[in-house]
Design a protein with these regions (language model features):
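Catalytic and substrate-binding clefts that recognize carbohydrates or anionic sugar/phosphate headgroups
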Residues: 1-155, 165-167, 171, 178-183, ...
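Generic recognition of flexible, low-complexity loop/linker segments
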Residues: 73-76, 84-86, 148-150, 177-180, ...
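A residue-level signal for conserved active-site and pocket-lining positions in enzyme catalytic cores
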Residues: 87, 144, 181, 221, ...
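Aromatic- and carboxylate-enriched substrate-binding clefts and catalytic-loop regions
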Residues: 187-494, 529-530
């Protein structure tokens, strides 16, 4: 049963496609004190959800803030990352789903201040709360997913291998990646372009000095069954003569300050303006700009910097420099030193800036801070709407960094700028079910880690998780170690894992489609299925993929294996590379499983079967019908 409670006159986020009637009277389960709602938790209550966030699948014991943030450090103390996914389920004697539909800031204190208390504090006075009552967590997830609409489905080739790096700055770099994969007999379907391809970081441009014939290069790579996927950023460079800027200024399509002047911010190009994606005409205009690149043969994009990320605002920058000037001729001691550092460090993504510009909507002018979490969603929807007109439904790849529930109908997301840390393998595993609950099924991580330097063993272990994620992409940061698999001596081991990805795709793709069409989980915590098994419910490092297989990746350096809990009897299938080297029936209970760097262990459930394709160099070469089956 779904109950909808409305407070004030909320802005319609369009997260919900079929709104139930509004309930009258007080909201049950919670005590209301102003805009704070409190819930008394039992000792054994688990709280699942909240999408893309740090820490566990069980969110109990921490504070989380729903505020799309340009956050490069995904460490345990963080409270916000790139997405705003305000849906969670309390799993205990009471099974209760809660969705807070508010595009501004929302704080969740889930047993942090008081272990037995869950607090929701909403900054805005206008919002909606949906309560979903059900007999099980899975039934509540299914009901919520029906409420928010069908998730995005990309083309089949988007399930292939992707290679990316901030630093592919020329046609030669692209061709070197192609050569590296083909020469080493490594399968690949996509090469991603970061901001390097643009002319001075201007959206919908190509640097002709680096790419002498971009369209021809795209065509040649496509002949080799490789698609090129460029990045698009939210900020538009301030430059007279740049058509996107000129058109936006002429039509009033950029966000403005309270005086009605374009709000100038700093991002990659320096001084930039922000398209007003809550203005429907502006959104359509910006979305149609993707045609500049689709006309060159591009069939996929990734949207970035769309929280929106701000290095500074022009106004705030001036205030910071004026503040720093006060210290120029002084004896700078401890506290003054901290004050100077804070002035500079807090210049980026400053709350004061987010409260200083406005959107023109169907409901009139609205302050950005009140709808902040919709910015990336509406940018990506503008792209999706246009790409569907240009290329057709399910014919384009699109994913975004920032997101809000509702955007899942338009695109996927990636899990953001992680680091080459062993702990982030586990973090990315934990994110998957939380995102699935919120409708984001096409998702994946920067395999190997975006920031810092990866190592051969770290990348191999990360690939052992990535093999099962819908979005498979190796991505790294400018200045970090190059981490294409052919850069390492263990290229044979990488080849085996990549080949296994393609062999598993008949199962993974069917699982993905079933998850979308039936509003089911792609990756589930064990506790969603074995609801009366306390060990299963507390297991935070294993997942069910679909309803047939369980995975338990190794995520600790120098480990030769790991503890695995089996809630029921299963068949262990051990792959060395893409070949099966062992099948063993294992009883329910706690086990230690050895697993070498070039091995992946899959656990097949009873009365299930796992289809396997033959190896292929690309998705287009994959034979989806000539399959063998492992059964139990």
């Amino acid at each position: 049963m779904i109950k909808r409670f409305v407070f004030g006159k909320p802005f319609d986020t369009e997260a919900i496609i079929n709104k139930p009637k509004q309930e009258e009277g007080n909201i049950p389960y919670f005590e209301k004190n102003g805009n704070t709602f409190s819930y008394e938790m039992d000792d054994k209550d688990i709280v699942w959800g909240l999408g893309e966030n740090v820490r566990g699948m069980n969110k109990r014991g921490h504070k989380y803030t729903s505020w799309c943030s340009d956050e490069f450090e995904h460490s345990e103390e963080k409270q916000s990352l790139y997405g705003a996914h305000n849906f969670f389920i309390i799993d205990g004697k009471t099974k209760l789903g809660v969705f807070v539909d508010c595009p501004g800031r929302v704080d969740f204190d889930i047993g942090d201040t008081e272990y037995s208390k869950l607090y929701i504090t909403i900054e805005n006075s206008c919002f909606e709360i949906y309560l979903l009552e059900g007999s099980s967590v899975i039934s509540i997830v299914k009901e919520f997913r029906q409420l928010i609409g069908t998730s995005y489905i990309p083309p089949k080739w988007a399930f292939g291998i992707g290679q990316s790096r901030w630093g592919y700055g020329s046609e030669e770099d692209l061709l070197k990646v192609q050569e590296g994969y083909r020469k080493n007999n490594l399968p690949v379907d996509m090469i991603y372009l970061d901001i390097d391809y643009m002319d001075n970081f201007k959206d919908f441009t190509v640097d002709s000095n680096k790419y002498r014939d971009f369209k021809s290069t795209i065509s040649k790579l496509k002949e080799d069954k490789i698609r090129v996927i460029p990045i698009i950023d939210a900020g538009v460079k301030v430059e007279d003569g740049y058509s996107v800027y000129d058109e936006g200024i002429k039509n009033g399509f950029f966000c403005k300050d309270k005086e009605g002047k374009e709000f100038i911010v700093g991002v990659w190009p320096g001084k930039s303006v922000l398209p007003d994606f809550l203005n429907k005409a502006a959104a359509r205009w910006f979305g149609d700009k993707y045609k500049v690149l689709t006309d060159m043969g591009i069939e996929g994009f990734w949207n970035d910097m769309n929280e929106p990320a701000l290095f500074y605002s022009e106004k705030n920058k001036q205030e910071v420099f004026e503040h720093l000037a006060e210290y120029k001729d002084t004896n700078v001691g401890l506290y003054a030193n901290f004050a100077m550092k804070d002035a500079v460090n807090l210049m980026a993504n400053n709350l004061k800036d987010y409260k200083s510009f406005y959107h023109e909507t169907d409901k009139g002018k609205i302050c950005h801070a009140d709808v902040h979490n919709l910015y990336g969603y509406k940018m990506t929807k503008s792209a999706s709407d246009s790409l569907e007109r240009i290329l057709g439904k399910e014919k384009y790849l699109l994913f975004s960094r920032a997101s809000y529930i509702g955007m899942h109908r338009s695109s996927g997301i990636w899990m953001g700028d992680n680091k080459s840390w062993w702990s982030h393998i586990l973090l990315n595993l934990k994110m998957l079910p939380s995102l699935n609950m919120c409708g984001f099924i096409y998702t994946g991580a920067d395999l190997g880690g975006f920031g810092s330097d990866t190592t051969e063993d770290l990348l191999l272990r990360w690939y052992a998780l990535g093999v099962f994620l819908p979005l498979f992409r190796n991505h790294s940061c400018l200045g970090s170690r190059e981490q294409e698999p052919y850069q390492f001596k263990a290229v044979d081991k990488f080849r085996g894992l990549l080949n296994l990805r393609y062999r598993l795709l008949p199962y993974l793709y069917e699982t993905f489609i079933d998850s979308v069409k039936n509003n089911e989980m792609y990756g589930s915590p064990l506790g969603f299925v074995w609801t009366d098994d306390e060990d299963a419910k507390r297991c935070e490092d294993q997942l069910l993929i679909g309803d047939s297989i369980m995975i338990a990746p190794v995520y600790e350096q120098n480990a030769t294996g790991r503890h695995v809990y089996l809630p029921e009897e299963m068949k262990l299938i051990r792959f060395k590379g893409s070949e099966i080297i062992e099948e063993e029936l294992m009883g329910a209970g706690h086990n230690y499983i050895h697993c070498n760097l070039d091995e992946i262990c899959i656990f097949l459930r009873k009365n299930k079967k796992l289809p396997l394709a033959k190896e292929a160099a690309s998705i287009e070469d994959l034979d989806w019908k000539d399959l063998t089956y492992i059964e139990y």
